[in-house]
């Protein structure tokens, strides 16, 4: 028998969570499909451009929003490259019910996954505390180096 899973949270192998990430997210999952927390970044040598988390770009305050509010903010702030994998916790039963999976062998699968996940949600908990550190490194698909 497969274990009972309440929530799922993703992490890239070169990133890390704050020690209290899970403990902070679980109580906020009550009545929502997703908890969206903030991220900060660490740049490897050679990166000069700035990176801001999507949550900072949306400038949302802590609390529950409807999916429609997220969509309206996306349109009003002209945020067309939305991605979501490692910046939140997802209700696992909800994820199974909507049958959303990552697309194999394509770049930026987190964009497709994130947009569909948020579009199908009813409620999203905005948690503007930085619970995740994102390491931007050489040869990353984000490619923020000056050699663009």
Predicted regions located by residue number:
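Nucleotide-sugar donor-binding/catalytic module of glycosyltransferases
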Residues: 1-148
